[in-house]
Every structure is written in structure tokens, then in C-alpha cells.
């Protein structure tokens, strides 16, 4: 017997995780929607069902958050190297600071008396100085792929450059593919 196909659903995103997944509360169950932001109304399709939560794919943003921006990278969404490029720099820092505070309180049982402002680059780009890149010879493409793994897949993302990597590292991706 064939599995029943689930219909797309609509929900309001009430919070966001450290890795850029929006959290919706649908009939008492948490649903993590990849790429959705706090304050947005989205249409999504559930992909993985668990006992306490579900994971979903974003189909459409019906009411966008003011934090949402156009990602700089052409392979954002496919590439697993970063998950918050669709969020403004200031809001990315706020999401990460909130995740740190939540983890310290929930896991470490520590509540700092005061917080220092995060240290960040002037414009926030590029911000990554280290990376673990995958390398795979793909005869069908006629070259070696060098890059991050695709999000939710074991494949190497076909990329020539990376917007978040510091320039000395970013400049090595394409030459390494030619080896």
C-alpha cells in the first residue's frame, strides 16, 4: 500500500534555532522548518516525522520577516557550509547570542550577570577562517569537486568560490579543482 502524501501546511514561526531553522507550533507539536525566520508566516511540507517534533521543508514565505535578506551566495540552500545567509548580519549575531545564552542556561545551569558585545567584522563578510572541505572526483562532470557537503545530502556541492571564507582560502577552491 502506498504511503499517504501529506498536504502542505501553513504556520507562523515563533522562534528560530541556532542553525537557521524556524520553529512552528502546529497542534501542540514542534515543527522545524528549514530556512524560515521568526515572525514569518510560511507554507511548508513535513519531511521527517518524530515522536516529539517534525522536520519540514520550506515551500513558500507568505509573510516575510524584516530580517530576511537576499543571500550573497549562488549555492546557498544547496551548500551545507552556512545556514544563516538569508538573515541580516545584526540578526545573525542576535540568533547566535540567544543560542549561546539558552545553552548556558539549559545545559550549563549558568546565567551570566552581564554580556559583552560580540566581536565582529565591520561588514560581517567574510567571517570564516577555517573550513573542512570535501574533495571528490566526479567523472561525469569531468573534474574534481572541492567544497562543502550539500545540506542533508552526502554529495559535494559544486562551487567555484565561497562568500563566507576568508580570501586566501576562498581563492584556493577553484585551483584545487583543476588538480
PLM regions and their residue ranges:
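Accessory RNA-recognition modules of RNA-modification enzymes
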Residues: 1-179
Amino acid at each position: 500500500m502506498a504511503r499517504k502524501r501529506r498536504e502542505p501546511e501553513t504556520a507562523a514561526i515563533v522562534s528560530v534555532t541556532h542553525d537557521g531553522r524556524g520553529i512552528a507550533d502546529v497542534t501542540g507539536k514542534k515543527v522545524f522548518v528549514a530556512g524560515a525566520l521568526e515572525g514569518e508566516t510560511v507554507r511548508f511540507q513535513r519531511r521527517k516525522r518524530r515522536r516529539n517534533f517534525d522536520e519540514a521543508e520550506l515551500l513558500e514565505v507568505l509573510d516575510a520577516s524584516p530580517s530576511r535578506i537576499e543571500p550573497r551566495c549562488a549555492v546557498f540552500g544547496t551548500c551545507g557550509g552556512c545556514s544563516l545567509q538569508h538573515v541580516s548580519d545584526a540578526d545573525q549575531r542576535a540568533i547566535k547570542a540567544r543560542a549561546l545564552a539558552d545553552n548556558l542556561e539549559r545545559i550549563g545551569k549558568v546565567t551570566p550577570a552581564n554580556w559583552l558585545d560580540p566581536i565582529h567584522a565591520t561588514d560581517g563578510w567574510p567571517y570564516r577562517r577555517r573550513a573542512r572541505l570535501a574533495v571528490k572526483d566526479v567523472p561525469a562532470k569531468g573534474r574534481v569537486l572541492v567544497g562543502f557537503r550539500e545540506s542533508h545530502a552526502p554529495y559535494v556541492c559544486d562551487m567555484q568560490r565561497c562568500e563566507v571564507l576568508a580570501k586566501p582560502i576562498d581563492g584556493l577552491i577553484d585551483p584545487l579543482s583543476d588538480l
